[in-house]
A protein has these predicted regions:
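Phosphate-interacting basic helix/loop segments used at nucleotide- and nucleic-acid interfaces
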Residues: 1-24, 68, 74-78
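Short aromatic-glycine motifs in intrinsically disordered, low-complexity regions
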Residues: 6-19, 84-86, 286-294
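Amphipathic coiled-coil signal-relay and dimerization helices
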Residues: 26-27, 33-38, 42-47, 313
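P-loop NTP-binding catalytic core
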Residues: 44-158
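P-loop (Walker A) phosphate-binding loop of NTP-binding proteins
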Residues: 156, 166-169
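Switch/coupling sub-region of P-loop NTPases
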Residues: 161-166, 179-298, 306
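Conserved lysine of the Walker
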Residues: 173
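Conserved P-loop NTPase
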Residues: 296-319
Length: 319
C-alpha cells in the first residue's frame, strides 16, 4: 500500500525523471524542475510546473521519510532525507531554514534531487577501458600557469582549478568572488555554502545552503553538508569564508573531484593564506602533518591575493 501511495504522489515528477535520456532531475525552488540530460550539448534544461508547489514538495519529503522510516523535521530536527525510490531512483532532499534559492526564502526553502540508477547495458568500453589501449586523461589539470597574472587567473577559472580568494578585512573578497562567478558558464549548476548569504550567483540553476555559526538549531552540520552537496551534483561549489567550523569539511569537499571550487579567507599574502587554511583544519583535525598539508594545498589550490591601501584595492598575487 505504501508504494502505491508514493507512486501516486510521485506522478507529477515521474514524467521528468523517468525518461531514459534523463540522468537526474533537480528542484531548487517550487514550480521549477531542472533535467540533466545524458550526453546533452547543454546538460541542464529547465521546465516550469505549477504542480510542484512548496506544499507538494514538503508533503513528498514527509511521505518518503515516513515510508522509509527516516527522521525528518526541517525546523527543529533533521532537515535532510535520503532514500531509494521505486525504480531504483536515488532521492535526496532538504527543506527548512538551511536551504534557500534567493533572499525571499526568509522562512527557508526546499531542494531535492532524483537520480536514475544508470544505464543497465553498459560495458567497460563506455568508460574507454579496452585491452591494449592507453587510459584517457580526462580534463587533466597539469600546471598551466602563464606568466601574465591576468592570464593565470583566467586559465585557473577556465580549467576549473580550485581558487582561494585571500585578503584582509574590506579588501573586497566577496565582491571579487561575485565577479568571478559571472565568468562561469551560465548553464552551470552552482551550490553555495555560507554562514550568512553574501554570494550573488547569476546562474539560475543554483542552491544556497546556510549554516549560521550562532543560530545552529538542528543537526545539519558541515559534516552532513558534505554528503548532501556531493549528491546534489554541482558543477560549481562556492564556500563562504573559511573558519574553524568549516575548514576541514571544505578541504574534504575539494577532494571530491568537483571543478570550480571557490572560497575566501582572511590573510595578508598567499603564503599566509595557505598557512591560515591549514591551521583552521588542524583545529578540528590535528592528525594532519602541517607541512605536508600546506604542500598539498599549494599543489591543488590557486590563490588570488587582494590588498588595500586607503581607497585603493588591488590584486597583488595570483599563484
Amino acid at each position: 500500500m505504501s508504494n502505491v501511495v508514493l507512486e501516486s504522489l510521485l506522478k507529477p515528477l515521474a514524467e521528468f525523471y523517468s525518461p531514459s535520456f534523463v540522468e537526474e532531475i533537480a528542484i531548487n525552488r517550487p514550480g521549477e524542475v531542472w533535467m540533466r540530460l545524458n550526453g546533452g550539448r547543454i546538460p541542464w534544461v529547465s521546465y516550469r510546473s505549477e504542480i510542484l508547489s512548496k506544499q507538494y514538495l514538503i508533503d513528498l519529503i514527509h511521505t518518503v521519510a515516513n515510508i522509509y522510516e527516516r527522521p525528518f523535521d526541517p525546523i527543529h530536527g533533521t532537515p535532510v532525507v535520503y532514500a531509494t525510490l521505486p525504480g531504483n531512483h536515488r532521492f535526496s532532499a532538504i527543506a527548512g531554514p538551511n536551504v534557500q534559492y534567493d533572499e525571499n526564502d526568509v522562512t527557508g526553502g526546499v531542494a531535492l534531487n532524483i537520480r536514475g540508477s544508470g544505464v543497465s547495458d553498459t560495458s567497460f568500453k563506455n568508460y574507454h577501458l579496452e585491452r591494449g589501449k592507453k587510459l584517457l586523461k580526462v580534463k587533466p589539470r597539469e600546471s598551466n600557469r602563464p606568466d601574465d597574472p591576468y592570464d593565470r587567473l583566467m586559465s585557473a577559472i577556465n580549467d576549473g582549478s580550485p581558487i582561494l580568494v585571500s585578503g584582509a578585512t574590506s579588501t573586497g573578497k566577496t565582491t571579487f568572488l561575485n565577479h568571478m562567478l559571472t565568468l562561469i558558464d551560465q548553464n552551470s549548476r552552482v551550490i553555495t555554502v555560507e554562514d550568512a548569504r553574501e554570494i550573488r550567483v547569476p546562474q539560475k540553476n543554483r542552491v544556497h545552503f546556510v549554516l549560521s555559526r550562532t543560530e545552529q538549531t538542528n543537526d545539519f552540520n558541515y559534516a552532513r553538508l558534505l554528503d548532501l552537496v556531493v549528491r546534489m551534483t554541482p558543477d560549481v561549489i562556492i564556500g563562504g569564508e573559511i573558519s574553524t567550523d568549516n575548514a576541514s569539511v571544505l578541504w574534504e569537499m575539494l577532494g571530491t573531484g568537483h571543478d570550480h571550487f571557490y572560497t575566501t579567507i582572511h590573510a595578508e599574502s598567499s603564503d599566509a593564506a595557505y598557512a591560515a587554511y591549514a591551521d583552521r583544519i588542524l583545529h578540528t583535525q590535528p592528525a594532519y602533518n602541517r607541512t605536508e598539508l600546506i604542500a598539498e594545498m599549494k599543489k591543488k589550490i590557486r590563490v588570488v591575493q587582494l590588498s588595500r591601501d586607503g581607497t585603493l584595492r588591488a590584486v597583488t598575487e595570483v599563484v
